[in-house]
Amino acid sequence: MKTSLLVFLGLLAVFLLSLAFLAQAPSPQEIPNPKIVTQGEDVEPHPPKSSFYGKRGVYLTAYAAANSAKLNEILAQSARFGLNAIVIDVKNNEGEVCYLSQVPKARTIGAVRPVLDLAGLVIELHRRGFYVIARQVVFYDPILAKHLGVPTSPWVLPTEAEAVSYNLAIAQEVEGLGVDEIQFDYIRFPDDGPIGPDYSARCQAVESFLSQAKASLSVPISVDVYGRVMWPWNAQKIDPIGQHLEGIARIVDVVSPMLYPSHFVEPELKADPYGTVLRTMRHGKARVEVPLRPYLQAFSMAIPTGMSFPEYILAQIKAAEESGADGYLFWNPRADYSSLWEALNLAQKERGP
């Protein structure tokens, strides 16, 4: 009788856990294609990691990567033009953990949105020759901020121990699913203060997280930083976001400055995609020796009059290459890279056979 009761209680616990997971999972209508690849018997689940140098690729949301038609089109075009990397969200700007995470806190706070079969997707991308970069949004996290009840919501600050341990646990789990690199984004404080005061304490908090990540992971780590972080004044630690180029560069393997000309305040920088990328990269390379792999603007915003969108993208590519960038990545939040393919086609024609 006692044994039967224990069995019944065990089955009841499993049933309740299943209900809890189903309650936090999105409906099928919310997921374009929740499982697009399966693990083949003849494919190694964790192939040898390739070098992080010389990577050129595009960014995809988890939802875009889970759409098999969209993904296959992007992979085909990427291969055609010699791109060799794919960046995919594993934790996005909504605070969603985009695969079937087993991290207890992710499940407890309802952050798990299993859009991707991440392990299977990594295997398929490796099979097709792509280096896989997992993008993890760190301190902009509406779900965690709401759970913690912090006044900085939707941000959690880098000084919040629970936010640090949560994100480290996710990164460690993602590493175990076979990705080649983890890229931390929103690895900063909110941009909510004047430039000028001493923000050394904020810089130290950001670098403390990165040091812990570096110590706990075996894959390369990269960091997305504001484009302005590359400019000389940043060396004084006077930026409220807490990103100090020299400090970050001492820890990580790659820095990815987001060099979108449209996001600069100065009109002359907005109007000159080539000059803006070239000058900003040269400033950064004069300060640090870490590989700089910039994000280039592949979304249509503030395109100068008289310049086509593909020409705008191509100008950035030329500047990145001339400045000595160690590869580059393209950002379009909708994964619409039609103008990028036009730009790369123009580049091929200019170079000739």
Locate predicted features.
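Boundary/entry segment of secreted carbohydrate-active catalytic domains
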Residues: 25-74, 78, 297-299
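Active-site-adjacent "subsite" loops/lids of carbohydrate-active enzymes
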Residues: 47-63, 120-123, 134-177, 314-316
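Aromatic-lined carbohydrate-recognition surfaces of secreted/lumenal glycan-active proteins
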Residues: 59, 131-141, 183, 202-242, ...
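Aromatic- and glycine-enriched glycan-recognition loops and surfaces
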Residues: 64-80, 107-128, 204-208, 279
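Short, acidic/polar
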Residues: 65-79, 160-175, 233-249, 306-321
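Catalytic domains of carbohydrate-active enzymes, especially glycoside hydrolases
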Residues: 71-96, 176-181, 248-256, 320-328
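Substrate-binding cleft of secreted/luminal carbohydrate-active enzymes
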Residues: 252-283, 288-353
